[in-house]
A protein has these predicted regions:
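Charged, heptad-repeat coiled-coil alpha-helices that serve as long linker/dimerization "arms"
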Residues: 1-128
């Protein structure tokens, strides 16, 4: 059960990094922008200019994907914490492999998203070295 306690600590330590990632990804701003774009898409005459309509729908799709990736990581974290707490409560070692693999996967997802953020947007013009 010590391993589960260790993973609970690891999960609690990684949670602030998940929140920092939300800030880096501008998730709240993305949600506001997405609401604005959805209102625009639902407005009368939106499809009158197909070029603009395609641009707006593409932008909305990109924002939806970004928000969905972040929310998936949050759900993944919640699920892992639940597994950890259940295993500790029930004294069940059978969930350890799932927890270990899930934690590794979450770390990789977060690192991939962090790197993508660094290599795009406002940081894109910076030198790699």
């Amino acid at each position: 059960m010590i391993e589960f306690d260790e993973y609970k600590v690891k999960l609690n330590n990684i949670h602030p990094k998940l929140k920092e990632l939300a800030s880096s990804l501008n998730i709240e701003e993305c949600r506001v922008d997405l609401d604005r774009l959805h209102a625009q898409i639902e407005s009368d005459g939106f499809w009158d200019n197909t070029d603009t309509a395609q641009k707006v729908t593409r932008q909305a799709s990109q924002l939806e994907a970004k928000i969905e990736r972040y929310e998936k990581m949050c759900t993944h974290w919640d699920d892992l914490m639940t597994i950890c707490e259940m295993a500790i409560e029930e004294n069940d070692d059978s969930m350890l492999d799932e927890l270990v693999e899930g934690y590794k996967s979450l770390e990789e997802e977060m690192e991939r998203e962090r790197l993508e953020t660094l290599l795009s947007g406002e940081y894109d013009g910076n030198n790699a070295i």
